[in-house]
Amino acid sequence: MKFFYNICIVGCGGTGGNFAARLSQFLSTSESKAEVILIDGDYVEESNISRQPFISGELLLNKAVALAAAIEDTYAYEVKAYPHYLNNIEDLGNAWKVFSYSSEYIYVDNEKRKLVNILVGCCDNHRCRQVMEKFFDKNSSLIYLDAANEFSEGEIVIGIRMNNRLLAPSRKFYFPEVMRSRGKRKSEESCGAVNIHHPQHLATNCFAANILLTIIANLITEQKIDGGMVIFDTFQYSCLFRKYKEDEHLGQ
């Protein structure tokens, strides 16, 4: 069976922007079939340029729109932009409607393919994560990758739901405080304020982006993915995968 991948990237900053560029380069030379949507309501600010994939000529442009245009210019690969914040699950549902295909099985170039939906969270806001967590719970089949990092350390959680069965849990299983956060939504907080509260490093963002690319590339080329959590520390040159085991739920 051949596959078609709907890949939705939420957040086009340091991790999401670098991941989107690497993913598009990979897909542009791959025989695989996929469609990519970038979601971000932020606009490019001067403070973004040091560690995010933007240039001074893109100041004040929407990040998703600017990144989509840059990717098409660089790799001749078209991605779609959804230049809005995700304040609730309906917002993410509306973004998902931008994808060309939604049926479980589709025909592309006269070939039958199974549709695989992938949500990649690259935001630094728990309120946005709450939206993605609810979307993951609501969908019968969805692969949900969520990346988070500080200056050097971080983790990527791989949640998998297939045919109404939870094969691997999402971030809230490991970090339940995510769902309790009542902080500002991203639409209520400037990117500059976020940078002050959560300082990050270009190398760390690129490290996280490369891990995300490895996970997706392995899925697309080998049809293999394991649920669990990747824990990394950029400046200790370390990366460890903790595979999810079903008996972990028994301890909850």
Task: Please state what every model-predicted region is.
Residues 2-15, 19, 114-118, 123-252:
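Glycine-rich phosphate/adenylate-binding loop
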Residues 3-31, 37-45:
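Glycine-rich adenosine-cofactor-binding loop
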Residues 23-27, 53, 136, 220:
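Active-site catalytic pocket residues across diverse enzymes, especially alpha/beta-hydrolases
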Residues 29-33, 222-225:
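Phosphate-handling active-site elements
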Residues 49, 86, 149:
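Hydrophobic pocket-lining residues within nucleotide cofactor-binding pockets
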Residues 59-115, 123-127:
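A structured beta-alpha segment of the ubiquitous adenosine-cofactor-binding alpha/beta core
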